């Protein structure tokens, strides 16, 4: 799948991870690295978790493992530390271990949207689409607004992966209604599909964006490039005119004027 489904970077109460340098600073404040205090300090466990996930997203797997293992050792009953290890095990391809860890986390936090979304993403990555959708559907029933948007988005991309276009369109459109900021990720995905030469997938994502959100310079530029590639000169000029009227100072309009498709 070209769009990551994992919600690991938003594991801690829906907030993105801090930069590595900031996490190091916090770690030094709450207790010296590898000091005896670290073994029982819950704040250190959360900092180790954040640090491990930051290393994971930067693909520094050895450092990620070391910090996530320390987080689990300090706070083994905290579902967040166990979920962090599940994400690591999933990343390195230890799917059997990840499955066991996810089941453990589900028992620890059965009504948690982040757990459901991450487990659903894991199942979707294995092609277990029906089981994945059960997790996403359960997460979508939770009252937390952001978790509903995440669940709809993940379910939509899972259907997108499975080639179930109608369901993908419906769910991704709903996700954008809940959280319009998700349009940024959708356009990024559409650009990746376009660069990979996947015209039908690109068209679908453009249509979802177009029918759900106001046009942006980036969305218009993608439509222009798509029309140019397809030889639809009328559409290319039409979108170019909209770009000129709405975003005359944008870099996308400068590319259009230079015919840099």
Regions found by a protein language model. Give the residues of each.
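Terminal, low-structured helical/coil segments at or just beyond the last alpha-helical repeat
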Residues: 211-261
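Structural marker of alpha-solenoid helical repeat scaffolds
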Residues: 74, 108, 142-144, 178, ...
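Bacterial Sec signal peptide processing site at the extreme N-terminus
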Residues: 29-47
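Register position in tetratricopeptide repeats
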Residues: 57, 91-92, 125-126, 161, ...
């Amino acid at each position: 799948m070209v769009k990551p489904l994992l919600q690991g970077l938003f594991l801690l109460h829906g907030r993105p991870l801090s930069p590595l340098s900031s996490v190091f600073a916090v770690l030094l404040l709450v207790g010296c690295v590898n000091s005896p205090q670290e073994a029982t300090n819950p704040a250190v466990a959360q900092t180790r978790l954040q640090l491990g996930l930051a290393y994971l997203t930067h693909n520094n797997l050895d450092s990620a493992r070391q910090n996530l293992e320390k987080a689990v050792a300090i706070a083994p009953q905290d579902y967040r530390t166990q979920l962090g290890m599940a994400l690591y095990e999933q990343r390195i391809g230890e799917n059997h271990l990840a499955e066991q860890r996810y089941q453990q986390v589900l028992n620890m936090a059965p009504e948690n949207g982040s757990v459901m979304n991450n487990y659903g993403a894991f199942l979707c990555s294995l092609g277990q689409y029906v089981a994945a959708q059960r997790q996403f559907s359960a997460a979508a029933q939770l009252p937390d607004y952001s978790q509903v948007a995440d669940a709809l988005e993940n379910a939509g991309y899972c259907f997108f992966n499975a080639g179930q276009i109608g369901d993908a369109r419906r769910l991704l459109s709903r996700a954008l209604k809940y959280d319009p900021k998700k349009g940024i990720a959708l356009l990024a995905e559409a650009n990746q599909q376009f660069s990979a030469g996947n015209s039908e997938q690109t068209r679908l994502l453009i249509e979802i964006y177009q029918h759900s959100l106001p046009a942006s310079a980036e969305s218009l530029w993608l439509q222009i490039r798509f029309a140019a590639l397809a030889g639809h000169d009328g559409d290319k000029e039409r979108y170019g005119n909209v770009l000129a009227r709405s975003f005359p100072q944008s870099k996308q309009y400068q590319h259009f004027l230079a015919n840099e498709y």
